[in-house]
UniProtKB/Swiss-Prot annotation:
HAMAP family to which the protein is assigned, alphabetical: LacC
GO annotation, biological process: D-tagatose 6-phosphate catabolic process; lactose catabolic process via tagatose-6-phosphate
CDD domains: FruK_PfkB_like
Record-listed E.C. numbers: 2.7.1.144
Pathway stated in the Swiss-Prot or TrEMBL entry: Carbohydrate metabolism; D-tagatose 6-phosphate degradation; D-glyceraldehyde 3-phosphate and glycerone phosphate from D-tagatose 6-phosphate: step 1/2
Taxonomic classification: Bacteria, Bacillati, Bacillota, Bacilli, Lactobacillales
Alphabetized Gene3D superfamilies for the sequence: 3.40.1190.20
Reaction(s) catalysed by this chain's protein: D-tagatofuranose 6-phosphate + ATP = D-tagatofuranose 1,6-bisphosphate + ADP + H(+)
Pfam families: PfkB (PF00294)
Name this polypeptide is given: Tagatose-6-phosphate kinase
Domain of life: Bacteria
GO CC list: cytosol
Alphabetically ordered keywords of this record: ATP-binding, Kinase, Lactose metabolism, Nucleotide-binding, Transferase
NCBIfam families: 1-PFK (TIGR03168), lacC (TIGR01231), PRK13508.1 (NF010033)
Length: 309
């Protein structure tokens, strides 16, 4: 069983446009609305892949009800109700670009935060892996992911963390370490205070920084160029083929789903990295965020090259 945690979920609205025109009216014909934010994308892909998954997070208002009502029935919904309204996030797809407008979301009270913490502990009983994805809602301290990871570690659960900014820094500087982190180059550059490129030797050097000590897996997304990964003391480069991209929204979350599945099934390094990248690519071939077409899985799986470097 895999538990996905989405503390600041959203309704994701996608507007495809041939051209985005500023300071005038843009009319959209094809609008897609889905339960969104990173963790909900993760749980949907895990469900498509056939994993047993339950989803939790903080939801409220009619938007929160929309999320529960529009998740597949095969996903176990174990959300914690709050008084504020769940947010809406808009992605405008135009001219090969993606422009996002993201609401901040509700403000949580101390009582609601404590309530979710107890709720989280209860959900761990039958879980092997926990994914923690996305931003923290207003009111939650920067070290809240650190707190949840500590609880999961005490209960013997593997954790996959996909966040950025102060929340990620708090985890890296804290005592409780996740099993996996998945920064991209931009997030890695922010953490280290210097611009990082796809230079493998430079990546090998920085991933051995004491900042990352105690983290079993560091999987750095290189976008269309695949992944650079560190597992304990071993480094890998993952080459992926060129594909036709319909929408890249949620592809990183699909990669997290593959990582979690690999951990839950005790797969070896190459199998885990291959699965993670295939799921990320499959999502990019779909219009719907957080969805994969398993009919294409085997063909893409055979095209991935994982090399120790």
């Amino acid at each position: 069983m895999i538990l996905t945690v989405t503390l600041n979920p959203a309704i994701d609205v996608s507007y495809p446009l041939d051209e985005l025109k500023c300071d005038t009216v843009n009319r959209v014909v094809d609008v897609t609305k889905t339960p969104g934010d990173k963790g909900l994308n993760v749980c949907r892909v895990l469900n498509d892949f056939g994993e047993t998954v339950k989803a939790t997070g903080c939801i409220g208002g009619e938007s929160g009800d929309f999320i529960i009502n529009h998740l597949p029935d095969s996903i176990l919904s174990r959300f914690y109700k709050i008084s504020g309204d769940t947010r809406t996030c808009i992605a405008i797809l135009h001219e090969g670009n993606q422009t996002e407008i993201l609401e901040k979301g509700p403000l949580l009270s101390v009582e609601e935060i404590d309530g979710f913490t107890h709720h989280f502990k209860y959900l761990l009983n039958d879980v092997d892996v926990v994914t923690l994805s996305g931003s923290l809602p207003a009111g939650m301290p920067d070290d809240y992911y650190q707190k949840l990871i500590g609880i999961a570690n005490l209960n013997g659960k593997k954790t996959v963390l996909d966040c950025s900014g102060n929340a990620l820094e708090a985890v890296l500087k804290g005592d409780s370490k996740p099993t996996v982190i998945k920064p991209n180059l931009e997030e890695l550059s922010q953490l280290l205070g210097k611009e990082m490129t796809k230079d493998f030797e430079a990546l090998k050097e920085v991933l051995q920084d004491e900042l990352f000590e105690g983290i079993e897996w560091i999987i750095v997304s290189l976008g269309a160029d695949g992944v650079f990964a560190k597992h304990n003391d071993t480094f890998y480069n993952v080459d992926i083929p060129k594909i036709e991209i319909v929408s890249a929204v949620g592809s990183g979350d699909s990669t997290v789903a593959g990582i979690a599945s690999g951990l839950a099934n005790d797969e070896d390094d190459r199998a885990l990295l291959t699965k993670a990248n295939v799921l990320g690519m499959l999502n990019a071939q779909e219009k719907t965020t957080g969805h994969v077409n398993m009919a294409n899985y085997d063909k893409l799986y055979q095209s991935i090259k994982v090399k120790e470097v």
